[in-house]
């Protein structure tokens, strides 16, 4: 067979002797060969891995840059991303509202603030308003410093914040006085005004201040020589109190457990939460900070130690503490715990729903409880009486998308930011009577709207469909497309899915996805997370792949997509799905995009936080689990028969310490070896000096998206349709 027109893949030496023996319940001892195990060694410790990255990038860049549509995509995305966007304003204890604002192409979004009395002046057509408080773009020369978490002290004088570099999970916590904001004219690469407090080796932002503002609880990990290279293990998490570095929690028998502390909004109670796996079920302990001495040691009382549920503290009224929990309520409930009567346990205040998941709960005023539910894939907000739990009414009944709320109990208002697949964001201001329920004064007002000039969003529509999976189960899917694209079986479709950890796919606005719909005259849809999480985990993981495959088949059968015109896209856990599906039905998909996925499911527990994921995927060293994991593990199930694999683009960051890059490296090497002269390309694009999704600058995201969409267009044989005007309207559709 001649060499394909796009050239030969970079060579890499296989080790045919590398193997591990596993125990199978069905087959006894099973020897599994791993010829690319050398790629498990990070690039900063291995010349082989370093050379592999270099050669793969040379190869992929040559292919991607040869596509004339790539540059057109790049320029189109730059123009289209140039629209202002912001987050929900949050009132803090220094009597300011804080919010993120980006005018379009800034690498990272700066933090702005405004005095409470001047909140009406912010987010106008002329700009953010208020004053610049903190700009992460000033911390580095190339926009790689990311603000990953913040926590204001109760007194309003101190602001704790975490900075990560290159999108890495590892972060450093700093503290600055709120009286020391950034200035736009300051020198880049520095952070003047911060205090001497520096806390390194943090991996997840768990910061909770005590009510005296003298310090805060935080979680950290010990230094590790693999920190930042994608292979550092997530073990030995410990809880500290910053002011005097008092060591609060250690469990040498369980080094893989995570610990964090939540302080109640009143500041009286601290909740110590232990997490041991990806189920996020917790060990829960409580302490009264008003009667404890942090210096001499906190006395913790165990509230729950059976690892059967998750808890988050909502607030408290004296000794009565309110929790959001899924204890004895699969979809979560609001429960109350009386510290003075612990024998009563967690009593139900608002029972769990049968068809809606309680996502968030906040207290307002004297007796108001605001609850945010997920119903199907949209959010619903209800107002309850905290004393009786009685539902008073639903607010924002005409909205059917994603809603984020902010506010404090002391406030008489909250902000609600709404978005969906075709709405970039509408900010509402909900007024709440502090003392009673009043239908005349408790009302929502339109505050601000995010506008996109590059597209006429009224030209798009989102449909909601149910389709049967392999076993007959009805699965939900969203489909977004231009109104003038019809179901005649000629359109391309881009499918996105995640399918794991009980994470639902909420309607999420993406200008890039709408541009795909608008330019390629296509159709887009979204796999609806896992409403039935247990039916898609462990030994039932195959159900997720069956659901995704059934969606593609349904779209073709019902003429939403043309045969061979379905492109699939997934990242992280979704990367298991795209690679497993392309192994199992390569003929069904016209193109496959995989972003930072897991592929070697027999080795995933050995790297980064992999050991915590056993509750989701199973333990390959357990004979029963081995049998079902080995059956679908993408790296071990590349087709042996003569098949034509679809065009495949793998996107990976070299310093990803959430999902180790070794998965992608090994899988791509194996695919290229198995199909060296196939008619379709198997391409690996490695983003250097970056981590798992978060922290990428706006321009890096635009460049990556241009590579993705031009690759899809070429793979599906699509022609770009750009009108002569600047609105790019009515041309493509994407699956969101």
Curated annotation (Swiss-Prot):
GO terms for biological process: proteolysis. The keyword Protease applies. It catalyses: Hydrolysis of Pro-|-Xaa >> Ala-|-Xaa in oligopeptides. The keyword Protease applies. Gene3D superfamilies: alpha/beta hydrolase, Prolyl oligopeptidase, N-terminal domain. Keywords: Hydrolase, Protease, Serine protease, Virulence. Coiled coil: none annotated. It is an enzyme of class 3 (hydrolase). GO terms for cellular component: cytosol. Pfam families: Peptidase_S9 (PF00326), Peptidase_S9_N (PF02897). Its EC number is 3.4.21.26. It comes from the Eukaryota. Belongs to the peptidase S9A family. Prolyl oligopeptidase; part of the gene cluster that mediates the biosynthesis of dendrothelin A, a highly methylated cyclic dodecapeptide showing slight nematodicidal activity. Excises and catalyzes the macrocyclization of the methylated core peptide of dbiMA to yield dendrothelin A. DbiP works in a two-step fashion with an initial cleavage at the N-terminus, followed by a second cleavage at the C-terminus of the core peptide. Monomer. This is Prolyl oligopeptidase dbiP. The gene is dbiP.
